[in-house]
Structure formats: structure tokens, C-alpha cells
């Protein structure tokens, strides 16, 4: 009974990819990979399984969302929950050997356990880049500009990139709150976009009216470069002001790249990825309720693999990007050759000739078809090779 119950079911959060969606993903993946390589990034693959003690611990994904298992030697393994930590491992151990910038890219599935009521995929495809070894703001601008270029190449119409700086938020919170516990509470509200909860908590704490106003004013710091000077008035520390200055430099470089019109500053932007140390960003499309991609600077991550190096990068969610793109043309050019046994050799020869021309061709024996009318609707055209002498038809 239990076997029948689960016969057509999938584990929680797992999804099938049917032919139409697979073809659409392939097209999107292809144009993005081509653009990434044009920018000089090299693709890399890492194992699906990693050690929990290394990549699992270095990942910013919460422990309860990791898929864990034991190997035969008793080591705890995890299905990779993101690609940044595995690439940091590879770079630290094998590739980042001379201290010069390293540009890597990836296209892979990642795995994150979901709650039953969450309704989100536990396995999803990401495509992205990591720029390792360059600590300049220009490097941050490069990966943001590349991300914008990728989205334009896919045909995505309207999207916006929100950019912030975790160093600014942390500096402001430390100045006013004085401890990490309170700061983490407010960061969680900001990540969840729960601004009502944020305001209520700020007002419930015994803070001066000036400090309350500073924390509340943070929520209004969104827009163009004019918010940078406003942001600097809320902080007194050098760290906070330096973070704001980095955003000013970033916007200037993005204007040089010609992508500044797609970018808006959001000084209250934070991420659930705890390894971000500086500039961070998210990209949104009107048709999707969640970010379709995110990224930022993570200068401390490679140190966990005993190879300190600055780094920045981003990842795009292919499933959400497909949803944002919406209706699009997918290749529907498969031809079919239906043949009887007497015409097998002729059918094979014709199929091979068409395939050599780059066409997609199905070769189908007439005896294997139950409903010829329904079957013929699947293909752009059908060639019939039937009977001993036969008669060709379209």
C-alpha cells in the first residue's frame, strides 16, 4: 500500500523538469554561458557531495536546511547547499596560487531542505560567477555589470538591482545597539522585509529618540546616489562612512559600464548569507515575488580554507528567471520519419542525412504508433515511408 501511495510522488521540494521547460532552460543556460565566457570567466564543476566539516560549515546556509548523510567511513557529507563555498575550497586548494585575480563560473544544482508548508524547491539550478583575489570596488561593479548583461541577453524585460553594504548596516547597528544579539534581531527583520516588525522592535527598546530616529530613517534610504550623503549623516564611525563612500565609487563605475539605470541603492539591504562582508545586491523582476539572483563581497570565506583572499560574485536562480521571462519562443522544429519495416534502410539513411544538416529528427516505426493523428501533432512535419514500393508524404 505504501509503495502505491508514493508511486507518483516526489520527495518534499523536488520537482520534475518536463520537455518544454527543459528546452527553455537549455536556451537560457546557453546564452548566459556564452556571455559569461565573453567576459573571460572559466567554468568549473565541483562534486555534488561535500564534507560537512568543511564546505558544509563554511556555507552560509542554516544547518537545519542541509541534506546530510554518512559515507561508509562514517564521515558526515552534505549535498552542496550553494556553489560559493565549494568554489572557495577549490580556489584555495588548487587554483589561487599566485595572488592574482581568478575568474570562475558555474552552472549547477544546489540543495536546501524545505519545510512542508514552504512550497519552495529543495533542489534548484544556479548559474553564476566568482571573482577571487580582487578587493577593489571595480571588481564588485564588474560582477554586477555582468549580471545585468546576462539578464538582458536572456530577453528579460524589466528588472531592477538593489545594492547595499552590509558593513554600513553593521556599523550603524553597533553604534546604536552596542551588541550583536540585538543587531541580529533587526537584521532578520530586514532580510524578511518585515518593516512593521522592525519598527515595533526599535520603538520597544530603551533608546534615545535620536537613536530611534536613526534606526527608523535607515528604512527610507533607497534610491539614487543622493541617499549616500543622507546615509553618512546617520553614522559616526569611520567604518560606516567608508562603506557609504564605497557605494559612491561603485555607482560611478556602474555608470561607466552603462548599467547604473538598472541599479537602485537600498541602505537597509541585508542577506541571509552570513559570509557577506561588504557590497551586496539582489535582483528583482516584476513577475516574481522573490529575488531571481543575489550576490556580494565575501572577503573572509577563503580564510576558512587557509587561503585568505578577497572575493565577490553572484548567483542567478534559473527557475525564477524562467518564471520572470514568461512566454517565449522555444524550438519546435523536430521532424519525424514514420516508416514500415520494408523501408527501414531508406528511413535510416534519410534521418542521418537530415541530422547531418543539423536538424532534429525522430525515426519511428509505424507499428509502434497507436494513434497516428495524435502522434503527428507533436512534430513540425512528418515524412511517411510506408509499403514495399511506398509513397512519400508530408
Swiss-Prot record:
Q: Which GO terms describe its molecular function?
A: catalytic activity, acting on a protein; histidine-tRNA ligase activity; transferase activity
Subcellular location, record wording:
Cytoplasm
Signal sequence annotation: none
Biological process according to GO: histidyl-tRNA aminoacylation; L-histidine biosynthetic process
Q: Does the keyword Disulfide bond apply?
A: no
Pull one GO CC term from this UniProt entry. Answer: cytoplasm
PROSITE patterns named among the record's database cross-references: AA_TRNA_LIGASE_II
Give the UniProt keywords, A-Z. Answer: Amino-acid biosynthesis, Cytoplasm, Histidine biosynthesis
The family database entries (Pfam families) matched by this protein are listed as: HisZ-like, tRNA-synt_His
Q: Does the keyword Cytoplasm apply?
A: yes
HAMAP family this protein is in? HisZ (MF_00125)
**Family as reported in the entry's similarity comment:** Belongs to the class-II aminoacyl-tRNA synthetase family. HisZ subfamily.
Q: What does this protein do?
A: Required for the first step of histidine biosynthesis. May allow the feedback regulation of ATP phosphoribosyltransferase activity by histidine.
Q: Give the note.
A: This function is generally fulfilled by the C-terminal part of HisG, which is missing in some bacteria such as this one.
* Subunit structure, as described in the record: Heteromultimer composed of HisG and HisZ subunits.
Q: What is this protein called?
A: ATP phosphoribosyltransferase regulatory subunit
Q: From which organism does this entry originate?
A: Geobacillus kaustophilus (strain HTA426)
- UniProt lineage: Bacteria, Bacillati, Bacillota, Bacilli, Bacillales
Q: Which gene encodes it?
A: hisZ
Amino acid at each position: 500500500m505504501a509503495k502505491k501511495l508514493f508511486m507518483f510522488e516526489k520527495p518534499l521540494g523536488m520537482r520534475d523538469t518536463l520537455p518544454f521547460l527543459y528546452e527553455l532552460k537549455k536556451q537560457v543556460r546557453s546564452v548566459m554561458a556564452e556571455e559569461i565566457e565573453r567576459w573571460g570567466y572559466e567554468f568549473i564543476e565541483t562534486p555534488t557531495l561535500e564534507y560537512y566539516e568543511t564546505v558544509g560549515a563554511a556555507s552560509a546556509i542554516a544547518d537545519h536546511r542541509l541534506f546530510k548523510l554518512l559515507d561508509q567511513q562514517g564521515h558526515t557529507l552534505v549535498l552542496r547547499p550553494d556553489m560559493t563555498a565549494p568554489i572557495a575550497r577549490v580556489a584555495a586548494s588548487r587554483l589561487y596560487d599566485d595572488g592574482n585575480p581568478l575568474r570562475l563560473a558555474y552552472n549547477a544544482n544546489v540543495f536546501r531542505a524545505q519545510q512542508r508548508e514552504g512550497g519552495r524547491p529543495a533542489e534548484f539550478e544556479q548559474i553564476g560567477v566568482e571573482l577571487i583575489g580582487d578587493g577593489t570596488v571595480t571588481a564588485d561593479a564588474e560582477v554586477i555589470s555582468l549580471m545585468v548583461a546576462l539578464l538582458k541577453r536572456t530577453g528579460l524585460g524589466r528588472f531592477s538591482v538593489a545594492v547595499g553594504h552590509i558593513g554600513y548596516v553593521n556599523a550603524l547597528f553597533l553604534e546604536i545597539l552596542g551588541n550583536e544579539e540585538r543587531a541580529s534581531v533587526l537584521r532578520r527583520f530586514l532580510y524578511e522585509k518585515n518593516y512593521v516588525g522592525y519598527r515595533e522592535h526599535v520603538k520597544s527598546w530603551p533608546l534615545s529618540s535620536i537613536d530611534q530616529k536613526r534606526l527608523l530613517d535607515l528604512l527610507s534610504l533607497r534610491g539614487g546616489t543622493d541617499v549616500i550623503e543622507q546615509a553618512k549623516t546617520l553614522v559616526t564611525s569611520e567604518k560606516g562612512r567608508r562603506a557609504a563612500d564605497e557605494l559612491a565609487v561603485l555607482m560611478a563605475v556602474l555608470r561607466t559600464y552603462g548599467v547604473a539605470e538598472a541599479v537602485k541603492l537600498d541602505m537597509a539591504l541585508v542577506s541571509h548569507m552570513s559570509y557577506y562582508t561588504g557590497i551586496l545586491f539582489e535582483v528583482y523582476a516584476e513577475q516574481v515575488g522573490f529575488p531571481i539572483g543575489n550576490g556580494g563581497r565575501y572577503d573572509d570565506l577563503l580564510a576558512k580554507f587557509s587561503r585568505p583572499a578577497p572575493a565577490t560574485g553572484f548567483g542567478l536562480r534559473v527557475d525564477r528567471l524562467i518564471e520572470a521571462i514568461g512566454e517565449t519562443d522555444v524550438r519546435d522544429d523536430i521532424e519525424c520519419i514514420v516508416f514500415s519495416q520494408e523501408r527501414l534502410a531508406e528511413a535510416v539513411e534519410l534521418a542521418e542525412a537530415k541530422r547531418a544538416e543539423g536538424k532534429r529528427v525522430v525515426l519511428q516505426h509505424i507499428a509502434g504508433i497507436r494513434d497516428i493523428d495524435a502522434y503527428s501533432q507533436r512534430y513540425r512535419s512528418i515524412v511517411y515511408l510506408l509499403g514495399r514500393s511506398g509513397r512519400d508524404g508530408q
